[in-house]
């Protein structure tokens, strides 16, 4: 999500760090900064916007020093600004950080009570103050870091400097990537390989709960608790472009495989397990306002519209509030009925989708409450809505959305719990059950990703088909729509998603031995109905690709091809079922030789109406 680069050695640190940050630009960012140490004094340069702004700042006021840390920030706590940009300093401690600290508010309140003053809105500054607080008591930099991290909950990749120990660089990892590069008398730290690949190909990959201390010309690895580790380096032969993609052939495949982490980042710090509730402070909707909602309109475009359709099922089922779902480009031209008891919820990955932004403005003008689900912090939609729920998917480079879609589904699930608790339709026990289900999702996604090789074989079998039909019922109908959209977006094969029960009202006329039909048939309340629809396809010679719950032998006996995934409960199944559909579209497109990451005629963010 963010980029980190650290250096300690005989060369000037700033050019190396700046070059590394440039090589991480593909990850997306909204601000950047560098800090070096020279003669025990920290010197920082930070700027909002692109790296060119930071570069110009450094050209006008150079940074000297042979030890330093740098960062590109994708905002999660606090809007993009110079004061929220990293590095952050508290006393003699300077920190750059990727990740999300779950208990930062609790730690911050304690530190403020003890007299500490904060200068930013970030969770990262809390880490700097906490380490400095420990350092004030121990006078030992390394010990202070270990003691501070013992109190931190959440995900982090950290690079830390101390003015009082200017020859030491410390890095730590928990839940966010961190790699160490080994050079000749010099060492590099980065959040991703591309940042340092031009300097060394000898890498040590840190694991969760590990810390590395660079002192006296060599690194010492250990656990945060202090147990020594014998880490082995690996030689990396990747090209720079391969490194940006994490070794994957395309950004889209990389982003498909990032989904477990993206979901974890989206729920981290938001779940109140004991209370059976969730914390969504950035939505700025108090319980009293939520109880005043008479109707919800969800407005979106493309993939986001498909997630909105799933949200309708969730909210009506659990919150008993009527929900309408509109395509943004249609919404503003039909004179919709909107009043002060209407909540307009818009969904946009980029936060800049022109039609969705126009719908938001229309609803605000009519007096509706407004909220947004966005991935990009401080985007136009995020700024103009009354409140926002950010999906922490990180930058999505591939035009065809994958991890942004899945995190939108998770965000809608979170909002459903919050709304249901506020209006009293979800009690504490039910909230705990729903949260328990959410906590399983990252692991279930990991299992679904294990079908990748099987999906590739299926893609090879059906890649020359001219048309595909995707069928689903209930909450899985929008997933059928999304699967069809993915295939047509990147493989240029015509595909349609349809409610399985509507097949006999038209599409059944198209079915023959040349048409693959992808049927979503997990074990749920409509299982028997979908099974019947599948039989109708088979009776007409259709070639059924069935995606079903793990262990469903009945489906395996009927379908031409079966893909089993771990669908844990009816309401979480849409999230898991998305994975094999994404993989199918991806592998068909690769086999057909299309431009997977930048398909023809499409743009990542549609900023024109």
From Swiss-Prot:
Keyword line: Aminotransferase, Cytoplasm, Glutamine amidotransferase, Repeat, Transferase
Domain (Glutamine amidotransferase type-2) ranges: 2-217
UniProt catalytic activity: D-fructose 6-phosphate + L-glutamine = D-glucosamine 6-phosphate + L-glutamate
SUPFAM superfamilies: N-terminal nucleophile aminohydrolases (Ntn hydrolases), SIS domain
Active site: 2, 604
Keyword Cytoplasm applies: yes
CDD domains: GFAT, SIS_GlmS_GlmD_1, SIS_GlmS_GlmD_2
Any GO CC annotation of this UniProt entry: cytosol
InterPro entries listed in its UniProt record: GATase_2_dom, GFAT, GFAT_N, GlmS/AgaS_SIS, GlmS/FrlB_SIS, Ntn_hydrolases_N, SIS_dom, SIS_dom_sf
One of the record's GO molecular function terms: carbohydrate derivative binding
NCBIfam families registered for this protein in UniProt: glmS, PRK00331.1
Self-association state and partner proteins as the record states: Homodimer.
The protein's name: Glutamine--fructose-6-phosphate aminotransferase [isomerizing]
Gene that encodes it: glmS
